[in-house]
Amino acid sequence: MSKQIRHRKIKEILLSSTVTNQHELILLLEKRGIDVAQATLSRDCSELGVLRSRTASGYRLMIPEDNPGQMIKGLVEMEIQSIESNESSIVIKTLPGRAHGVGSFIDHLKNPGILGTIAGDDTVLVIPSSVHDIRSILDYMQTNLLNN
């Protein structure tokens, strides 16, 4: 089964059904003749921008329809509490349990000045490609992670 077909089926299911978690999505895909490992489904959901959103009846997996990048940026903005730096790195403090999502968002921005991120529970360590780029990375983060 090609990734393209799997992605299309995932979109169809999420747009037509209330799906509360990935396990349920796997079962719905299996009913449609698509066998997929949980790790593969997790990657597919990430690539499609699938969000787990709270609704009046509980949680639901959803595909954002209007400008998903802007929607995710809005969520990231709400999760960041502070951004600080020293002469060698940048530390982002987030709401508890949200550092992984913020770190992943930063990684997906693919800024060449950022070597990578390491996320804990409420802290993201941003490692610059060069310590000489700290100021420009901070400016970049102000523009791309926070409300201006």
Swiss-Prot record:
Gene coding for it: argR
GO MF entry, a single one: arginine binding
Keywords from the UniProt entry: Amino-acid biosynthesis, Arginine biosynthesis, Cytoplasm, DNA-binding, Repressor, Transcription, Transcription regulation
Pathway info: Amino-acid biosynthesis; L-arginine biosynthesis [regulation]
InterPro entries hit by this protein: Arg_repress, Arg_repress_C, Arg_repress_C_sf, Arg_repress_DNA-bd, WH-like_DNA-bd_sf, WH_DNA-bd_sf
Cell location: Cytoplasm
A GO biological-process term: L-arginine biosynthetic process
Protein name in the entry: Arginine repressor
Naturally occurring in which organism (per UniProt): Chlorobium phaeobacteroides (strain BS1)
GO cellular component assignments: cytoplasm
Source organism, top-level taxon: Bacteria
Family per record: Belongs to the ArgR family.
Residue stretches spanning the membrane: none
Functional description taken from the UniProt entry: Regulates arginine biosynthesis genes.
